[in-house]
Amino acid sequence: MSRIVKKGIVKIDQEQDEETFRENLAVQRNASAFFEKYDRTEVQELLTTTLVSWLAAKDDARSQLETPCGLMSQMNNAGFSTAILLTPVDPTALLDYREVHQILRELAIGIYCLNQIPSISLEANFDQSSSCQLPPAYYDTRVGQILIQIDYMLKALWHGIYMPKEKRARFSELWRTIMDIDLDGKPQTTKNVFSEFSSAGLVDITNDPDFNGIYDEDMNEDPTYEPNSPEEKAVFMKYAESIMMKLTFSTVQIQQHENIFIFETAYWLSNAIKYNQDYLDICTYQRLQKRLYLQKKVIQKHFEKKKEIRRGMGYLKLICFLIPFLLSLKRKMKVPYLNSLLPPFSDDKVKTERELPPFIYGRDFKCQNFDYKQHQYFHVHGGIEFDISTHPVESALDEFKKNVEKIWECASSASAEDAGYKEVYPIPVMELNGKSYYVIHFELEIFYQQLYKTQWWVAINETVNNLKVKRLPLTEDQLHEQFKKKFGLKKAMKCKSIPFGVKSAVERGLSAVFYTFSRKTSSSTINVSDEAGYAIFHHAALHNRVSVICQLWSANFNVNQRRFIMFSQADSSKVDMKKERNGPTPLHLAAQACSLEATICLLCFKADYTLTEKRGWMPIHFAAFYDNICILIALCRKDPSLLEAEATAENQCTPLLLAATSGALDTIQYLFSLGANWRKTDTKGNNIIHLSVLAFHTEVLKYIIELNIPELPVWETLVEMLQCESSKRRMMAVMSLEVICLANDRYWQCILDAGTIPALVNLLKSPQIKLQYKTVGLLSNISTHVSIVHAIVEAGGIPAVINLLTSDEPELHSRCAIILYDVAKCENKDVIAKYSGIPALINLLSLNKESVLVNVMNCIRVLCMGNESNQQSMKDNNGIQYLIQFLSSDSDVLKALSSATIAEVARDNKEVQDAIAKEGAIPPLVTLFKGKQLSVQVKGAMAVESLANCNPLIQKEFLERELTKDLLKLLQAFQIDVKEQGAIALWALAGQTLKQQKYMAEQIGYNLIISMLLSPSAKMQYVGGEAVIALSKDSRMHQNQICEGKGIAPLVRLLRINKIPEGTLLSVIRAVGSICIGVAHTSNPMSQQFVVEENALPVLIQLLRNHPSINIRVEVAFSLACIVLGNNSLKKELQNDEGFEYSDVLYLLHSKDKEVCLKAGYALTLFAFNDRFQQHLILETGLITVSIFEPFLQSSVETERAMAAFQIIILAKAIIDVEHVTLYGRGIQILADSLNSVHAPTIALTGNIIASLAHSRAGIPEAFVSLGTVQRLCYHLYARSEEVRTACSCALGYLTYNAHAFRLLLTECRNKPNQFLRITNNISKDAKINPAFLKEFQLQQRMGLPSLSLERNGGPPVIPVFKKGKEHRQKTRPKIQPRDSLTLLPPVTNVKELFRTTHKANISHNTFSFPSGVSSDIINVSRPRIAFLNKLGKDEQKANPDPPAFLNKLGKDEQNANPDPAESQ
């Protein structure tokens, strides 16, 4: 560098022109003006920093300094006059050339003249404002503005608070006045503090659209850790004042070819805690680090969302390279030629803020990182630093070398274009090597003084020398003023004590103050240690005070100074001061506190980076453990061998092993990228996996898993730890697995493949309750997978889990119940029952802990699904009474869950149904529907459905309690699942008789029925179809009303839906047919026409021919027969227009399914009923032989024989191998014999068939009469079954059109007058009876009946009648009495179900079973993700002899407290 001129402007001789003189004068004036922007204190700081900087050009110093690694020590030939820089482009935030030139100009002045590199540190003032502590050379510069802008946004995201620049600049001037701050920094105002800040422009940062909702996302992947728990917040706030969040930039790649430099930079977000180990132990540090890591993740994810921030980061990356580049040029005696740069910004455009106003939280602010009191404002702290060491310089790639000329052309073209003023000065961009690069160039000049000319750096240096004499050192008043401004009056007074003042100045970074103290005080006084043994050098390194370090080094202080401590002698009253031989050096503390500038400075001062402290740690071990990547980079660049340096004491860990121990994930990733040896282990054989597990750093484990290195088998290592003898290693392995399995949906498979399950099952047999608890917690998290369940069963896990149910820990019971729940869902119900699982679970129902009861009942519910033996076990072991008692609990969850459990215990098991009803379940179930919780009512409806299914007595009891009204309310709910359950429960109460079903359908009403048909729910559609069948069966009035109410269209619409469940489709098809057919196989032309007009025939024909289900096809055939029954025009339309042929049905007669075959015959029977032409068509289409019907005619099932007899009578002329007369006789004889049956369904069916045949063909009624049918029918009028009485009355009604039957029945009624009443009371409204018969009987009645004359004369009645007492009379009339009561077939069953047996009258009305599983709702299993150990032993165990006594407390006292993560570990 040029020798500084000592005095004034160089005198010019006569040959020097006047212009040179003016230029020199202007340079001198500009140099003086440069310092005018500083006040006195700032000038003093500027001068001190400039004079003491290790970057100062001192010949005696340079020989003793080591040059930072990379560019500064490796730059090749610098004989070029123009530098060209290439750096990658961010197309979303383009840089501006004028800004770049402004930055270059400011850096040149700061580095070449003032020996300062840019950085920023926000420091706390005593009044809670924050000082923007820039190197004084960068006050009022564009560099300073960018640093403040980026750092402020970093702190804004960290705290969730923001104030725009213009508003905060104004508020900085006024806030002290508004708050009425006193000399101690305390506010004296009575105003609302937050309101004042808010009105000044302070807002929640989430109000910005770019940052909306950023704190709502949960970054925490460890369920064991609750960062916002009161305990975690309290610990964090204890150290919050000393926690920093800072950005560090480093150049990670440099290539050079001649004067072209290609570089890339990166940045890291780091946190540092400015405490040494005496005040912050390692455990607390890791606790703080865990919370800080989550905060960093949020900032890293959202920091660059705004374009201005991305642009600012682009400038900082450029600055990161320019600093070592300019330092290198300075060493090569080259300096940027500032006159060639674009015009600088005016001074008013580069003003920097000297301080920032405090932050304060509003009540509704989203960020919860800090926990300050309401109306408490606070300062912010952190910074930005640049690593001046760089990656080694490499030769440029061939791609760049080949395009040198193009690069030059691009750079020179930009120079020509930059002339003149522009709003934007774009930087030229080139595409090279597949990437876009900025092409930045600037000219250089020689860094020497020229004769007769004063360069700008010479003028500035001369001004500095002149000011030094005037401004340094500080006076006593100036010292006090500085302390008072930074610390307040009280602490300023304390600072008059030199040791205290020196330490305070070092911690706060007051360079001029320390400079003054060092001039006034001896070295021994300056270097005094504090009570903890730390000297000023240690504090300077800890707080990153480079200027102080430089002054200490200049004063020949030991750069490797160890910590001093006081030892007290046991046998002496003296206290000796002894040097701690293995205490930390300043470099250790700088590495711990992420003091990057201090670290590089100390390395340049030749600090020994191989020294170890008492644990054997070198500085690189500190950097690795405390996750300070930037320090690690600087040290590894200094000496690459440090990458594998082992600690000399304790476990001899490498940096990678220490990083794994502390969970420093960023450092681990960087060390892997450098190729660190991950095979190394400590002295105990622990590798990074073991150490991560033992320290419970699951994030590190997940990273290693994703690396997928075969030699680092995480899963196998965990299994090995599960099987070792150390209880701690087993526990930590289980805890790690518990967290990891929740991190990724596919990890359960890895756990399974590694053979973990047998090892876990073995741990269940351990005597350690905590280990058992953690193990079942892990298993309950992965047992949702079928493969895991199979592995648990194969490893003998079921008896081990059931044995744990006898322990005294409710939390253990809860987790075991979850596992058994999952096991039971995978078809292992009988295995659980085999090991007495159900009695053990029933015993747990006496506990008073809701979370346990929820899981136990869920387990019981699943065990009883479709398992009759388990249902019976619940009854035999007195489990039902607990379930019933829970129905009266105050907990809605228990009410709902007990209802759902009762539903599964009772499903399809009449014995258990009766037992539940006997225990008194019905009253509390009905009471559930009086509450307001819809979810509880839904589960109650589920229980009602299960109990009432095929159980007339329970149905009657529910109906008598008017439950129908409550269930109908569920149909009006908005949620589809609520409607579904309500509909299914209602239809379960409809029972199996037509009368009851018709009553229920009438209660539902036409509107709701049609609404169900229009619903997207298959269950609703099914119930709607069944309701239509019930209403329309044998009731022309209802059929017509459905047609008029537009009920046909929804049915036909459902027929057109492709993806509809088969059971629903069957119901809809039957409903369409049922609407068209009446009593005794009469037709309804009106409804038939409505169906045809809705274009149902083409849809049905398509289903008949194309549907894959044969059950659907045969049902369609039957419905088609109903639609065209007795309607010749529709038959012609069906056959001519729709192409229907009997071959579409005839082949079904040969089906292997007997029910299909019988139903197909029934369909053909309806087509041929009273239609000889159709019988002829059937005969021509296919050959029907009696052998088809023979299996049914000889069947042991009476209803099958009766139906087959009906078919052969109607189809007699279409059967080719037997005379039709023979078939008539055989069929009639079978039907006549069927009337002798003792089974009501057989008699009812036979009566309806006789009614149909009575108006079918001449001669058939006479044949029935000759066989004594009239007498048998009259006998059955006394039957208890209403269906039998109705069917027989209809048959007698139609037989009255036969003269012989007319006379027989008239005689019967004359002799038994009540017989006539029985016929007329029971006959269906749509059935026919001969008017002549009615008229004749009335005539006979008026004339006097023989039986009545006997009674009138005192004789006994012909038929004895038992008269009940008054108390019984009200029960003689059924409560449910709809207008129509005739039945042919139970309409909610298909024919095959009716004909299956004569021994079971109660046939399930469901044509298919709906899933009985429960959707995700209130009764879900309580499956906590993590088993917290602090919950063990907290619940008092006691049996509950009287369950209702404690049920009132459940639901009120159960709170899932968030445990302390430390305790859980």
UniProtKB/Swiss-Prot annotation:
UniProt keyword 4Fe-4S, yes or no: no
Pfam families linked to this entry: Arm
PROSITE patterns noted in UniProt: ANK_REP_REGION, ANK_REPEAT, ARM_REPEAT
Topology of the protein relative to the lipid bilayer: Single-pass membrane protein
Repeat region (ANK), residues: 532-561, 582-611, 615-644, 651-680, 684-714
Superkingdom, taxonomy of origin: Eukaryota
Keyword Membrane among record annotations: yes
Segments passing through the bilayer: 313-329
Localization of this protein: Membrane
GO cellular component annotations of the record: membrane
Gene3D superfamilies per record: Ankyrin repeat-containing domain, Leucine-rich Repeat Variant
ARM repeat positions: 745-784, 786-825, 827-865, 868-907, 910-949, 1085-1125
Predominant subcellular localization, coarse grouping: membrane
SUPFAM superfamilies: Ankyrin repeat, ARM repeat
Disulphides: none
Sorted UniProt keywords: ANK repeat, Membrane, Repeat, Transmembrane, Transmembrane helix
Region (Disordered): 1431-1465
Name of this chain's protein: Ankyrin and armadillo repeat-containing protein
Name of the gene: Ankar
